Amino acid sequence: MTTKVAANSAAYEAIVRAGPRVKQLQQVHAHLIVTGYGRSRSLLTKLITLACSARAIAYTHLLFLSVPLPDDFLFNSVIKSTSKLRLPLHCVAYYRRMLSSNVSPSNYTFTSVIKSCADLSALRIGKGVHCHAVVSGFGLDTYVQAALVTFYSKCGDMEGARQVFDRMPEKSIVAWNSLVSGFEQNGLADEAIQVFYQMRESGFEPDSATFVSLLSACAQTGAVSLGSWVHQYIISEGLDLNVKLGTALINLYSRCGDVGKAREVFDKMKETNVAAWTAMISAYGTHGYGQQAVELFNKMEDDCGPIPNNVTFVAVLSACAHAGLVEEGRSVYKRMTKSYRLIPGVEHHVCMVDMLGRAGFLDEAYKFIHQLDATGKATAPALWTAMLGACKMHRNYDLGVEIAKRLIALEPDNPGHHVMLSNIYALSGKTDEVSHIRDGMMRNNLRKQVGYSVIEVENKTYMFSMGDESHQETGEIYLYLETLISRCKEIGYAPVSEEVMHQVEEEEKEFALRYHSEKLAVAFDHCEG
C-alpha cells in the first residue's frame, strides 16, 4: 500500500511539474497508462484541469471521456476552467453533460455557467440556468446572484438585473458594481449615477471598478462636478490611478471640454496602454487641437509606446480632418497600411473623405470613394454623407444633389438624407424642389431626430431641445434669452438662417435660431447663477 501511495504521489508531482504544456502532459499521461494509473480519478482530474488551462480543448475532452463516471468535482473543475478561460460554449456544453449525467451542480457551477451565458449574451439559456439555480436551492446564493446581475446587464435586461439585485439578502460591492456598470453600459447613465448614490447611502465604499463605470456615466451625462469629485476622491484616498481609471478620467474631461485636465491625468499615469494613448489623442482631435494630436501620435511611435491599433488611427485621422492637416493625414493613412499592415475600415475611409472634402479637395475625395467602389467598399452611407457635407461647405451644389440622391437610394427612410438634399436645393435657389422634398417627407412621415443639449448645474444635469418649454423655469429662461439676444443685436448680431433646415418657413427658422437647445441651456445656467 505504501508503494502505491508513493507512486501515486510521484505521478501527481510529475503532472504539477509538467504544468499547462500539452506535450509534457501527454508524456505524463502515457506514463500513467503504462504504469497502471491511467484511470486514477484524482490524477486524471489534475491532467484535465491543466490541459484545459493550456486551451487544449480537444485533448481535454478526450481525457474527460476516459473517466467512466465523472463526479461533481471533475465537472466543476472543467466548468470553472472553461468559464475562466472565456470558452463559454464549452462551459455550457459541460454543464449540460453534467445534468444528463445526473450529477448535482453547486453554487460554484451555477456561478461559472451564468458568467459564460453573460459572455455569450445568451439570455434564453441564462434564464434557464437561473431557474435551475432557484429550483436547486441556490437562488439566493450571494455569488450566484452577483453573477446573475452581471448576466442580465450584459444581455441588456436591466429590469431583470434590478429585480435580482433587489432580492439579494446581502448585497456585496461586486453586485453594486455590476449594477452601476450595467446601467452605464446600456446607455442609462442617470440610473447608474443614482445607483452609485444608493450604494453610498447603504454604507458601501466605492472601489476602482465602481469609479470606472461611474466616470463613464458622468462623461455620458456631462456631470463634470461629480466626475471631478471622483478624481479628488481617488487622490485623497491614495487609490492607484491604474490604466482603466486614468483612461476613464481622460474620457470624462474630454467629453466635458477640459483637454488640459485630460492631459494632466495622462501625464500622471504611471502605466499606459493603447486605450489611454488613443483617448488622449481623441481628446485633442475632438476639440480642434489637431497638431497636438499628431505630435502625441508621433511620440507614441518614437518613445516605444504601445503599438497603435485601428481605433488609434481613427482618432488621428479624425483630428487631421478637423484641423485641416491634409499632408499629415495622408502620411498617417499610409503608415497605417504600409508600416502596421492594418486594414482600413469604414471609419478610416470616412475620415479620409472628410479630411479631403473639408480642405476643398473634392475631386480627390470623390476619386478616393470610387477607388473603394471598385473593391466593393463604397456602399457605406457614411462615406457619401461626408462627401455631401464637403459639397455643401464648398457650394458644389450639382455634385451635392447627385450624392444626396445616391444616399436616399441607399437609405430611403433616413430623414437626414432628405434634409440634406433639401438644404442643397435651397442653397442653389431651387425652392420648388425644396417644397417637393418637404411634401414627400410629410407623406412618408419622415422626421429628423430631435437634438438635445445637456448642461450640469449644481451637480444635476438638465436636458433641453429646441423650443423646449418643459422646464419649470421656462418663463425666466426665455425672458433672459430675449434680453440677451436684444443686446447682441444692438452690437451687430444677425442670425444666419441658411444653417437651419431649409424646408421650414422663415419664421420657423427665426424660432429655431432664437430658441436653439444650446442657447436655452446656457440661459438656464445664467438664470441659476
Each language-model region and where it sits:
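Terminal (and in a subset, N-terminal) low-complexity or junction segments at the ends
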Residues: 1-172, 181, 190-201, 205-529
